Amino acid sequence: MKKKVIVGMSGGVDSSVAALLLKEQGYEVVGLFMKNWEDDDTDEYCPAKQDLIDAAAVADKIGIELEAVNFSKEYKERVFANFLEEYSAGRTPNPDILCNSEIKFKAFLDHAMALGGDLMATGHYAQVREKNGLFQLMKADDGTKDQSYFLYRLNQAQLSKTLFPLGHLLKREIRDIARRAGLPTSEKKDSTGICFIGERPFQEFLSRYLPRAPGEIQTPEGKVVGQHHGLMYYTMGQRQGLGIGGSKDSNGEPWFVAGKDMQRNVLIVVQGHDHPLLLNDGLIADNLHWIAGEEPKTHWVYAAKTRYRQPDAPCEIDRLDSGTAEIRFGHKQWAITPGQSVVVYESNVCLGGGIITSAL
């Protein structure tokens, strides 16, 4: 009997090809379109209506059933509330990571199983491998598109039910497959930005949910060089949008955000990309999650990323205790950002990671 796979279909080319490949591999395939955001569903910023139309057109083309489900309540409670909480505390969260572990691979997975699915699948660029009774999350073959960073919070139960049909393909190959199959999404551009913000200005969006609290921009020595609009709008290493380019007595080098003093509501800035305050030897992380269900060895050489699309950086886990980890890098890392995730790898295997609380 054919295994039934419930495929998350977003209306984009990747999930379209994922569904097509699974159908060709002999699975019974059902597409499931998720709606995760409702507050201001304007076509300009959140094109969910068009995405559903596109997903339906693809499902019709390849001859599969498409269902739709609304997870906006779950998204608001499990992802968006944390997003606002983190920004209020001066950190820079990554809601896509929480969306994966709480919505796409929890709420979606539960719904997929309720629909009688044996497995679920998405168009993520990653791979799953079973080895010695454990499921491993592997990097995709296309290193420029690998999304394992966003999936590091998945667990054994989730991975055991998940297929990533695109993990061994390059992006250009996926476009070619879509064109050859005549899929309506073959030329559709990739979506960018946080899913619920879309293409809209970030400050405009955030100010609707959190109060603005303007304050001073200062150098580490305490010199006032400008005014900020609210600490929540800025992140470590930020260069654009500071409004202090022509500050008097400046040495002509660009300004970068180097810290936030939450108690005084002061934004700390420095000049020069390689200023010492922007270069870090390591970090402390909490909220740890290890995919295998057990901690990795300490004082062992791994690699880690502290942001998406960053090259892997050699590191050691110096300490693991009380739910926190201290990670030291072989060479200095630039603008490590509290609230972002550090994700640890051993070769192409994603081991897990945690949320950065501070840089060292």
Swiss-Prot record:
One GO BP annotation here?
A: tRNA wobble position uridine thiolation
Q: What is its main location?
A: cytoplasm
Per the UniProt entry, the disulfide pairs are: C99-C195
Site (described: Interaction with tRNA): H124, Q340
Keywords for this entry?
A: ATP-binding, Cytoplasm, Disulfide bond, Nucleotide-binding, RNA-binding, Transferase, tRNA processing, tRNA-binding
**What GO molecular functions are on record for this protein?**
ATP binding; tRNA binding; tRNA-uridine 2-sulfurtransferase activity
Annotated region (Interaction with tRNA), positions in chain: 145-147, 307-308
In which compartments does the protein localize? Cytoplasm
In residue numbers, the region (Interaction with target base in tRNA) covers 94-96
By sequence similarity, the record places it as follows:
Belongs to the MnmA/TRMU family.
State what protein this is by name: tRNA-specific 2-thiouridylase MnmA
Originating species: Methylobacillus flagellatus (strain ATCC 51484 / DSM 6875 / VKM B-1610 / KT)
